Structure formats: structure tokens, C-alpha cells
Amino acid sequence: MTRPVRTRFAPSPTGFIHLGNIRSALYPWAFARKMKGTFVLRIEDTDVERSSQEAVDAILEGMQWLGLDFDEGPIYQMQRMDRYREVLAQMLEQGLAYPCYMSAEELDALRERQREAGLKPRYDGTWRPEPGKVLPEPPAGVKPVLRFRNPLTGTVVWDDAVKGRVEISNEELDDLVIARPDGTPIYNFCVVVDDMDMNITHVIRGDDHVNNTPRQINILRALGGEPPVYAHLPTVLNEQGEKMSKRHGAMSVMAYRDAGFLPEAVVNYLARLGWSHGDAEIFTREQFVEWFDLEHLGKSPAQYDHSKLSWLNAHYIKEADNARLAALAKPFLDALGIEEAAIATGPALDAVVGLMKDRATTVKEIAEGAAMFYRVPAPDADALAQHVTDAVRPALADLVAALKAADWTKEAVSAALKATLGTHKLKMPQLAMPVRLLVAGTTHTPSIDAVLVLFGRDVVVSRIEAALA
């Protein structure tokens, strides 16, 4: 009988989380949702010196922002130490593990001799119990590590969902340390116990874990567990072709939110960063879950492309509800010095956002464009001298008169502009540029008629009249 699908995301909270990391959460999340299974969040925090609550919070915040909800967890390895010690004791009792008293200095010397002899450096089994073998006398006052009795013969084989069939001879694997002298268990051991206890059926993770897999499979089988399906994802490269990392300039997941990206755009982009569904570039979260499979995971490293993500974000911004975008824009407006009172007494932010979003690739850009509606204009003196000339002043005066009498609609404002152009034999930029400067404080705005309608008749008329006085 097929086991119910159970996947996991098992990050180490030792630093910030970037897109390459969070992709290892997205794919197992999607597979669990597709298969009506269970998605488990496990925090692998046994590296006490490097782990931090701040990093845990960043993981949880990033997952929440992207909508990667988990069914179980977060489960912390440090809270499972009693269980690990129980299994270690069981392995010692059953002869699956043994104490090793070889010191770090002795191990280094052994490896150096092996290198000089042209051999692969590895533990030589000095303290491994064998029938008829006489072990050295344990040195006084030395606490041993525990090593797993790896099979000496045979081959570890698994059918990786990405890499295909992988075979590793047991002769290439030495007896792995599974507990330190103070009794604390090692990562590779904890992972096996966790995956077994949590009935994980599919392990979807980065291919930097491939070398751990044969060791983990051997420990799992020794404990009577059934190996999961493994899918080792190729590395995510940055735009320079290096492995994505903080050291090489990767942004944290939440930095994308803070730069004005929408979570649905990031999820869509991440989904395509190592998986494909035909030629589909843009798809909803629901479509992604429906289409996701392990068979179409990419076999080559995927390279991050910021311009592609920006293009996707621009698409989702155009599709997004104006009220939602307005709420998202407020923190950016606040950072630009626009106070809540100015927004409350100015043009409706929903409408302003609706006008600005077609020109923006991020919510931050929407806010930067929207700010002119909530500030007193301070146009550049050189720009004023260039555009608000004596030749155009009569046209501005006529435009003000027309706007005072017009219905306050985009169509009526457009008609007033065109009528003024005709009367004074001007081209649109000759009139629109000074109007933009005087009303908005900048020459860069969307369609002038739409902008004037949002500013409102009183503001438009008073600002142009003030310049003509």
C-alpha cells in the first residue's frame, strides 16, 4: 500500500534565507498540496553556536509572506535530544554503533599517511569491533565519539527524482561519527531519526546534500526504516553565475517584500527557477499546485534573472486590486515623508495607485510616482524657465478659464486641453509640460488629463493661477 505523501522543509537557522533556500520549501510544499499530503517544517538547530531565534523568525516570516503554510511544526531538533539519545543507546546495544577513542590528532596523522600513500583519507576502523579482533585499551580519561557501523560491502542505490539512478559503493564510505564525545548527536544522524519518526516519504532538497544521502540511507536501513524518495535540486546561481549566497550578494526573501515585490510574483518566479510546465511562464498558485510534479524538475543549475522577476512583478501589479496595492504602498509613502494626514486629505489613494500601477515594476515605484499627489510641488527652477515661458502664459490663462467651467471628467479635461492647443497653435508637450510642472512639480507623469482629474479642480486651478500672478 502506498504511504500518504509527507514532505518536509528542514532549514538550519544560521543566517538569512534567500531565494535559493526558500525554493527548497516551495517544491515540497507544492508536492504535498498536489498529493493531498502533509508538509512538515523542521528547524535543524543543533549547531547551537551559529543558530539564532532571529534566523528562525526570518524563516517563518518568509514562508508566511509567500503563503507556504505548513501542517506540522515547527519541530526543533534541540527539543528532540532525548529521542536521539534513545536511538543512540539502541544502536549501541544492537551493535549498529560503537565507541571510537581515536583522537583528532591521531585521525589527522592517519589521513596524512593515507594522502602520502595516494589513498583517499578515511577512518580505518581501528576501534570497530569485529569477531576475533582485539581492540586497543581505551585511554584513561578520554570520552569517545560514537561511530555508525557502515556496511563493508555492497552498494547504496537510489533512484533520484532529479539525478536518476545513483550508486555508491560502501567501500567508499567510512564509519560516520554520529555522536560527539559529549554525547550530542551529529546532523546526519538526527536527520535520519527525524525523517523516520515523521514518516517522510519525499525529501526534496538541494544537491549539496547528495553526498550525505548514502550515509543517511544506510543508517535508516539499519534502524529498520524505509528510505524516502529523494529529489536533489540543482544549485541556484546568481546573475554572475556563482552559487547564490549572502556572500555573493543574494537578497533575503523579505528584502524582496521591502523592495516592493508581490509574493505571488516571487512564487511564480521561484516555481520556474528549476521546474517547468511546457512553455507556461505566468500561472497562479493554484495552477502551480495542480501542475507540479517531480518529473519536470530541471537537471541543470538555474540562474537567477532579476529582470525576469521584475517583469513578472509588473504583470502581477497590473492584475492586483487597487485597494490592496494602496495598503502596500503606504509604508513606502511613509518612508518618502508623506504623512497619513496628507493622504487622507489628498486624492483617493486607490485611484492614484490605479493610475500609477501600469508604469511600475514594484510597489515602491508606485509610491514614488504617487508621492507627487500628496506634496506641495517644488519644481526645478531651470525646468520652470524652460517650460513656463512668456509665450505659453496666455495659453495657461485660457486653460484655467476652460477648466473652471468644464465638467471634472477625464474627457472634459482632455477637451479643454485640446481646445487650448488649437486656439494658441501649440503642440501638446508645449502646454502639458508647464502644466505638469506647476501642478505636480515634475515633467514625468502619466497621461496629463488623468493626472489633473485626480488632483482635483481646486488644486489644479490654484497652482496654475499662482504661477501666473
UniProtKB/Swiss-Prot annotation:
It catalyses: tRNA(Glu) + L-glutamate + ATP = L-glutamyl-tRNA(Glu) + AMP + diphosphate. It is found in: Cytoplasm. InterPro entries: aa-tRNA-synth_I_cd-bd, aa-tRNA-synth_I_codon-bd_sub2, aa-tRNA-synth_I_CS, aa_tRNA-synth_I_cd-bd_sf, Glu-tRNA-ligase_bac/mito, Glu-tRNA-synth_I_codon-bd_sub1, Glu/Gln-tRNA-synth, Glu/Gln-tRNA-synth_Ib_cat-dom. ATP binds at K246. Signal peptide: none annotated. It comes from the Bacteria. It is an enzyme of class 6 (ligase). A motif ('KMSKS' region) lies at residues 243-247. Its EC number is 6.1.1.17. A motif ('HIGH' region) lies at residues 11-21. One of its GO terms (molecular function) is glutamate-tRNA ligase activity. GO terms for cellular component: cytosol. GO terms for biological process: glutamyl-tRNA aminoacylation. Transmembrane segments: none annotated. Keywords: Aminoacyl-tRNA synthetase, ATP-binding, Cytoplasm, Ligase, Nucleotide-binding, Protein biosynthesis. Belongs to the class-I aminoacyl-tRNA synthetase family. Glutamate--tRNA ligase type 1 subfamily. Monomer. Catalyzes the attachment of glutamate to tRNA(Glu) in a two-step reaction: glutamate is first activated by ATP to form Glu-AMP and then transferred to the acceptor end of tRNA(Glu). This is Glutamate--tRNA ligase. It comes from Burkholderia ambifaria (strain ATCC BAA-244 / DSM 16087 / CCUG 44356 / LMG 19182 / AMMD) (Burkholderia cepacia (strain AMMD)). The lineage of its organism: Bacteria, Pseudomonadati, Pseudomonadota, Betaproteobacteria, Burkholderiales.
